[in-house]
C-alpha cells in the first residue's frame, strides 16, 4: 500500500507493475497445473510415451543405450493396465474443449474405451517389447523409420508431445512476463526504499 501511494504521489512509471505481476501469476497457473498433470500421467505414470520417444531418438542417432536402460525395468503387461487409467485421469484434468488429439481417436475408434485402445496398441506395437524393438533397429535405416512411423505408439507420442509443447509455449510466455515484472519491481523498490537491504537482482 505504501508503495502504491508512493507511485501515485511521485508519478513514477511503476503503477502497473503489481497488477501486471498478479495477472501473469494468475494466467500461468492453469498451464503450470496442466503441464504437471501431463508429466505425472503420460510421461511418468505410464511409460510407453517416453519409451516411444526414445525409440525414435535411437532410430535417428543409432545410440541404443538409453533405450536399453529403459527396458531394464519396463513391464509391458503392467503398462498396458496403467495407460488406460492415466488417460482417463488426464482427461478430467484438462479443458474438455482442448484435449490432446489422441482422445478424438479413442472416442471415434474405440467409443471412448481406454482399455480397448491400450489393448490394441500393445498388441500391434513393437515399442513395448525389447526384442521386437531391437530387431527393428537392426534393419536398414529407411526401414526403421518407416516401421516406427507406422507404429501405433507414435500416434500417442506425437499427440502427447504436441500438446505438451503447446502448453509449454504458453507457460514460457507468461513466465517471461513474470520475470520481466520481477526485474521492474526490484528497480522500483530500489527507488522507493534506496537504503533497504535486499538480495541482488542477479537472479532476476
Which residue stretches match the model-derived regions?
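Terminal presequence/propeptide segments associated with secretion/organelle targeting
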Residues: 1-204
Amino acid at each position: 500500500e505504501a508503495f502504491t501511494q508512493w507511485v501515485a504521489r511521485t508519478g513514477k512509471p511503476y503503477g502497473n507493475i503489481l497488477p501486471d505481476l498478479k495477472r501473469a501469476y494468475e494466467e500461468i497457473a492453469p498451464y503450470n497445473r496442466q503441464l504437471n498433470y501431463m508429466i505425472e500421467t503420460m510421461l511418468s505414470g505410464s511409460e510407453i510415451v517416453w519409451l516411444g520417444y526414445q525409440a525414435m531418438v535411437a532410430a535417428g542417432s543409432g545410440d541404443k543405450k538409453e533405450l536399453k536402460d529403459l527396458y531394464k525395468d519396463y513391464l509391458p503387461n503392467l503398462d498396458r493396465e496403467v495407460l488406460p487409467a492415466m488417460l482417463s485421469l488426464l482427461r478430467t484434468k484438462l479443458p474438455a474443449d482442448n484435449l490432446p488429439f489422441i482422445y478424438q481417436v479413442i472416442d471415434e475408434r474405440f467409443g471412448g474405451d481406454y482399455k480397448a485402445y491400450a489393448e490394441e496398441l500393445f498388441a500391434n506395437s513393437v515399442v513395448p517389447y525389447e526384442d521386437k524393438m531391437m530387431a527393428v533397429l537392426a534393419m536398414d535405416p529407411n526401414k526403421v523409420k518407416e516401421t516406427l512411423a507406422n507404429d501405433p505408439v507414435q500416434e500417442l507420442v506425437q499427440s502427447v508431445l504436441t500438446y505438451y509443447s503447446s502448453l509449454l509455449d504458453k507457460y514460457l510466455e507468461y513466465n517471461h512476463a513474470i520475470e520481466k515484472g520481477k526485474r521492474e519491481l526490484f528497480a522500483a523498490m530500489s527507488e522507493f526504499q534506496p537504503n533497504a537491504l535486499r538480495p541482488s537482482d542477479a537472479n532476476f
